[in-house]
Design a protein with these regions (language model features):
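Extended, low-polarity transmembrane helix blocks
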Residues: 2-78, 87-106, 113-199
């Protein structure tokens, strides 16, 4: 008798839960990627653009001739080895620095406007991984426990394992869900392809 009452109560609770949250999931699911893009814009867009600006060289050709600081940020140990003489580095180093600088401008912009969002978010995941490894092993952050941090501890603000885990969560959400309703991806998919957005 009592088990039946307990089962009935659980059934009513499950029904109430589904009645409340199923419509929310059904109608507001597209809000998740939109919120992810908003949070990215509010917290990370200017961070990446400010970082990219420090990498530009002088004048209009600065987009092709990065600053010395750009090389020092991306290849710190190699720059130390050549006593910060950029002319001693190879074309490979130049190509990586230029590509990284452009990526810091272009990929965040694509995410914010919702254009090729999945590809841009995937590119940013790769960028953040390389950035984090450079911070740890190039700039010596691995030697400082507070920089690396740790999961499941009481300190929530380490640069790598805590902060960038949240960055990754936003980016992975966009890779999985796409840009959401208010995006260029949605406009392109409906007007040009006549299909739901997949970019």
């Amino acid at each position: 008798m009592f088990p039946n009452r307990k089962t009935a109560a659980m059934d009513r609770l499950a029904f109430l839960h589904d009645s409340l949250f199923s419509p929310i999931e059904r109608h507001l699911d597209g809000l998740v990627p939109l919120l992810a893009r908003f949070v990215f814009a509010a917290t990370l867009l200017m961070y990446f653009w400010s970082s990219a600006l420090t990498k530009l060289g002088d004048g209009i050709m600065g987009i092709f001739v990065p600053s010395t600081g750009a090389y020092a940020q991306i290849f710190p140990k190699q720059m130390e080895a050549v006593v910060y003489d950029v002319s001693q580095l190879s074309i490979f180093h130049w190509a990586v620095v230029v590509a990284g600088t452009w990526a810091e401008f272009i990929l965040p912009l694509l995410i914010v406007i919702g254009l090729f969002t999945r590809l841009a978010a995937l590119g940013m995941i790769g960028f953040v991984v390389v950035q984090s490894l450079t911070d740890l092993y190039g700039h010596g952050g691995i030697a400082h426990a507070e920089t690396l941090g740790a999961w499941f501890d009481k300190v929530p603000d380490s640069v790598i394992l805590d902060q960038r885990a949240f960055w990754m969560l936003i980016l992975v959400t966009l890779v999985i869900k796409g840009a959401g309703a208010l995006s260029f991806d949605r406009i392109l998919s409906r007007q040009i392809l006549g299909a739901p957005a997949t970019a």
